Amino acid sequence: AAAKYKEIIENEDTYGYILEPDIRTLTKEPEANYSKEIVFGEFHNKTKNYFSGPKSELPEESGGWCDYMVELEFFKSMPEGIRKDAWFLTKVTMTGQERNPETGRYPLLNWDDPATNQKHPYWKKNIESSDWVFNYDDGYYETKGISSASGKTRMIFRYADILLLYAEAVAYGTKSIDDLAFDCMWRVQERAGVPLISKDVTKEYFQKAVFNA
């Protein structure tokens, strides 16, 4: 496995894969639809009725269906940073309440606020559509009234996975950690906005770090 991953990584220009510089690009439609980071994904075309359903990953207070939620311990264990901010929906738009007369916006509460009915945060990375767009500048969802139709490609396997799978294969299948494995870890960690692993760590520490990356 390590040999095949290494071949892909060392020839990423030939294969055409990239690690998007800004992880938030992967959460946006249409930017993410044809991202070269996606190795395998479900492409959707809402104009042809082959669309994904962003309502499945939204809380009920926002008009969602509450089908997919984030496992709570996984959420708590992920290091704070740009990746966590991009991946998880931690704010609930209370669409059933009155809008703010000055901003025209619905109240926005933390997912664990007692006023919500939520016990888990939600995934943010799959829900953007033309009707439901996250404004990163002020941390707010701009909604025209959400639709179940989205043309966003759902990511199943990304180039980031290949980088980490190589690091994992080296960590568990060889006697020592090579420079490429460290480089793969650093690329993923740097983009995630978390501290980079030191080359002085033990093999056991590296194994755990790959699992948590």
Annotate each predicted stretch with a short phrase:
Residues 1, 172-175:
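Short coil/turn linking the two alpha-helices of tandem helical-hairpin repeats
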Residues 7-163, 172:
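Elongated scaffold/linker segments in the mid-to-C-terminal portions of large proteins
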Residues 185-213:
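Conserved catalytic neighborhood of penicillin-recognizing serine enzymes
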